[in-house]
């Protein structure tokens, strides 16, 4: 009992440490790319080196760095070309911020869900009862089939004999003697 009590406070102590105040990995990557003067962009190794210089532990968070780069490429805020990453000249960020249109759609959907919810529950109960009754008989048949089929399949396998290896004729030795 003493070991379990000692483990639980440790877990509680770690949780506040995980909350980081500061830029995210993707923000750090974007900052590194904007700061670099390389025209061709930054390689993955150069990016990691830059992040390490900014105080980010790249060795521990290797997966996070890779996922952040993939997300940035998917968002088209970063362009990948021949193993190098560049900042996109025309990032499509302003198009996505449309909060006014989303709100009325959500309200309409909620109303529709409330109306449809009651009939769905009734039909689901009926279907479940039917499924339970039907499922019992096919299971028995399947078990019987499975038991019979392996016995039949095994008998011809035993009768097969292994292939005999053919002797290779060596033409190279004969030529060497001449």
From Swiss-Prot:
This is Protamine-like protein. Its main location: nucleus. One of its GO terms (molecular function) is structural constituent of chromatin. InterPro entries: H1/H5 (IPR005819), Histone_H1/H5_H15 (IPR005818), WH-like_DNA-bd_sf (IPR036388), WH_DNA-bd_sf (IPR036390). It comes from Mullus surmuletus (Striped red mullet). The lineage of its organism: Eukaryota, Metazoa, Chordata, Craniata, Vertebrata. Belongs to the histone H1/H5 family. It comes from the Eukaryota. Residues 8-21, 94-178 have a biased composition (Basic residues). The keyword ATP-binding does not apply. GO terms for cellular component: nucleosome; nucleus. Keywords: Chromosome, Developmental protein, Differentiation, DNA condensation, DNA-binding, Nucleosome core, Nucleus, Spermatogenesis. The keyword Plastid does not apply. Replaces histones in the chromatin of sperm during the haploid phase of spermatogenesis. Compacts sperm DNA into a highly condensed, stable and inactive complex. GO terms for biological process: chromosome condensation; nucleosome assembly; sperm DNA condensation. Residues 1-27, 77-178 are annotated as: Disordered. It holds the Pfam family Linker_histone.
């Amino acid at each position: 009992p003493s070991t379990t009590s000692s483990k639980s406070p440790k877990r509680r102590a770690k949780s506040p440490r995980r909350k980081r105040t500061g830029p995210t990995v993707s923000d750090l990557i974007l900052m590194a790319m904007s700061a670099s003067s390389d025209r061709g962009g930054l390689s993955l190794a150069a990016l990691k080196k830059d992040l390490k210089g900014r105080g980010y532990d790249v060795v521990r968070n290797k997966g996070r760095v890779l996922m952040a780069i993939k997300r940035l490429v998917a968002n088209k805020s970063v362009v990948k070309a021949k193993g190098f990453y560049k900042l996109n000249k025309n990032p499509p960020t302003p198009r996505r911020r449309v909060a006014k249109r989303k709100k009325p759609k959500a309200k309409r959907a909620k109303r529709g869900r409330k109306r449809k919810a009651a009939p769905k529950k009734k039909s689901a109960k009926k279907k479940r009862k039917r499924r339970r009754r039907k499922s019992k008989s096919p299971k028995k048949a399947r078990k019987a089939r499975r038991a019979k089929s392996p016995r039949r399949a095994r008998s011809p396998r035993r009768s097969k004999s292994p292939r005999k290896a053919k002797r290779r004729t060596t033409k190279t030795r004969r030529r060497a003697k001449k």
